[in-house]
């Protein structure tokens, strides 16, 4: 639940992360050990244009953005990221934490197309 609240905060600031994966979620220290923090905003992007007060226009990115294992199906298909894609990545992370692995993890080295097919 805490990770969803953190992601909601990022989205409320008009940003999408675009590279959610377990190594980008860290736990606090000392009295903050119960808090999860999302880090590494190197691939993040604004999804809301403050000048026009509109969502950014749809573009095909023509390439995978982020980690293939935890990225959304849209990312595998080269589509523009949105808030939904961050939520899909978070769902994969939660499944990974619960089960210890994802069904498509071994397919990563064989190509992104197989990973995308497995997710669909």
Regions from the language model: what does each represent?
Residues 28-65:
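Activation segment/activation loop of eukaryotic-type protein kinase catalytic domains
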Residues 19-20, 37, 47-49, 103-107:
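Intrinsically disordered, low-complexity regions enriched in proline, serine, glycine
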Residues 52-54, 64-79:
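Protein kinase subdomain VIII
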Residues 1-12:
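Short C-lobe core helix of eukaryotic-like protein kinase catalytic domains
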Residues 30, 73-120:
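Conserved C-lobe activation region of Hanks-type protein kinase-like domains
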